[in-house]
From Swiss-Prot:
First-level EC class: oxidoreductase
Catalyzed chemical reaction(s): shikimate + NADP(+) = 3-dehydroshikimate + NADPH + H(+)
Pathway(s) served: Metabolic intermediate biosynthesis; chorismate biosynthesis; chorismate from D-erythrose 4-phosphate and phosphoenolpyruvate: step 4/7
EC assignment: 1.1.1.25
Residue sites binding NADP(+) per the record: 79, 127-131, 151-156, 219, 242
Name used for this protein in its record: Shikimate dehydrogenase (NADP(+))
Source organism phylogeny: Bacteria, Bacillati, Bacillota, Bacillota incertae sedis, Caldicellulosiruptorales
Transmembrane segments: none
Protein task: Involved in the biosynthesis of the chorismate, which leads to the biosynthesis of aromatic amino acids. Catalyzes the reversible NADPH linked reduction of 3-dehydroshikimate (DHSA) to yield shikimate (SA).
Family: Belongs to the shikimate dehydrogenase family.
Keyword terms: Amino-acid biosynthesis, Aromatic amino acid biosynthesis, NADP, Oxidoreductase
Quaternary structure, from the entry: Homodimer.
């Protein structure tokens, strides 16, 4: 039986195995997907060594906080990873580890389904890590020319200017000044507000008087409605959580590992419903 993994620091509440194992079963693929928690960088190194030696491992997904660290161990990267400098999917190809990013594809598809136009909109990204990079790249692929980025460490937001200098303009915003400007769309890519710390929010809409955003997106899916999204809805913004993004990026990863074809919309809805029950 072939093996697939999700690696990250804390995966107790991850529903990725549910999604992937359902897809594998649907296509009759003899493989199992499971979570592996890695508490530190040393354990990440050990995991990579294990993967290289185990002939049954096809590949793995990466989540917080290793989406950037994993590149150190990869032999090749896809074009999007070369730009984004973060990966969420790795495939074993012979002796080589090849890094891909399907996060931006999942994000882009979930945004397109909501029917929100991002062109010529003032967009604020909260966070500047691997998830933020995928989000920014997805927006670029949707025609966005510039984005505002607020991060607790201003230097990290500033560093994204160099990452994306060839494709779009990054406008860093100091964390404490994130309420001063008007935005049409606000996107949270941080883990602030994720279960179990559900009272937290990366943006206090009570403090925000510059205008009501048209759309507010949270990459978090557990809880399904974060404090961040609840407050945005009270103000009148349309909102979306990260569950569809999670499912759609998983589908794209399976395509990389097994060259599967697109899944039917009815099957995707079935997966989404099962995920909603699990959260």
């Amino acid at each position: 039986m072939k093996k697939l993994y999700l690696i990250g620091k804390s995966l107790k509440h991850s529903i990725s195995p549910l999604i992937h194992n359902k897809i594998l079963s649907n296509f009759g693929i003899d493989a199992v997907y499971s979570n592996v928690e890695l508490p530190d960088f040393e354990k990440l190194k050990e995991f990579v060594e294990m993967v290289k030696k185990d002939g049954d491992v096809v590949g793995f997904n990466i989540t917080i906080p290793y989406k950037e660290d994993i590149l150190e161990f990869c032999d090749e990267v896809s074009e999007d990873v070369r730009i984004i400098q973060a990966a969420n999917t790795v495939k074993k190809e012979g002796e080589k580890l090849v890094a891909y990013n399907t996060d931006w594809l999942g994000f882009k598809r979930s945004l397109e389904e909501v029917g929100i136009s991002v062109k010529d909109k003032r967009i604020l990204i909260l966070g500047a890590g691997g998830a933020a990079k995928a989000c920014i790249y997805g927006l670029y692929r949707m025609g966005v020319k510039e984005v505002f980025v607020a991060n607790r460490t201003y230097e990290k937001a500033e560093s994204l200017k160099e990452v994306f200098q060839d494709i779009l303009k990054i406008l860093p915003v100091e964390w404490l000044r994130r309420y001063e400007f008007k935005y049409d769309i606000i996107i949270n890519t941080t883990s602030v507000g994720m279960f179990p710390n559900i009272e937290s929010s990366p943006f206090d809409f009570e403090n925000y008087v510059a205008g009501i955003p048209v759309f507010v997106y949270d990459m978090i899916y557990n809880p399904p409605k974060t404090t961040f999204l609840e407050e945005a809805e009270k103000k009148g913004s349309k909102t979306e959580n990260g569950l569809k993004m999670l499912v759609y990026q998983a589908v794209e990863a399976e395509k990389i590992w097994f060259d599967i074809v697109n899944l039917s919309q009815s099957f995707l809805l079935e997966i989404l419903k099962e995920c909603e029950k699990k959260i």
